[in-house]
Amino acid sequence: MRVNFKVNGRPQEADDVWEGESLLYVLRERMGLPGSKNACEQGECGSCTVRLDGVPVCSCLVAAGQVEGREVTTVEGLAEYARHREDAHPGGGCASGACGTSVQDAQQWQANPEKGATDSQTGEGGGVFPRATLSPIQQAFIDAGAVQCGFCTPGLLVAADEMLERNPQPSDADIREALSGNLCRCTGYEKILDAVRLAAARQSEGV
């Protein structure tokens, strides 16, 4: 089976996909995107969270064939995704997710290397966007010290970014609910909550 879909804004084609193959396997083994982690393979831990047409999903539970013609955003694409939001809503603080991104916008999002955009798979590149630029939520996780072993971090980043996009001023209860599907054994969650609070505060201040 051949599957055509977009990954981080770039059209991709996966050949010889077997019927039971998961999106997680395709991303890691066929697309060379190891950010989404393979842990429980039962949709319990959230380490493999990606956005499918803008909606957070556990990629271990999504059959590869289900993404035909659809848009997938992984942790590797978060920085460019945030820049796309800012481009769509300039001056509104939307690089950190304040304005939201429609499914239509996500589906029309295209990497544009000739304008100096970063590589949409690795998040690296040059031109107008410095190499290895981070999204606001990624920077907040670093600044708040919210990373230890890092295995759960990609899923947490994707889930937190989506939550801040639709809810730019979340309460602690909102944050806990949004991240309830993401498990962490290291941090006790407090630093993770601090990071999301920090990202929310920065976007409300337009930082």
Regions found by a protein language model. Give the residues of each.
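Signature of N-terminal electron-transfer/Fe-S-associated modules in redox systems
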Residues: 1-207
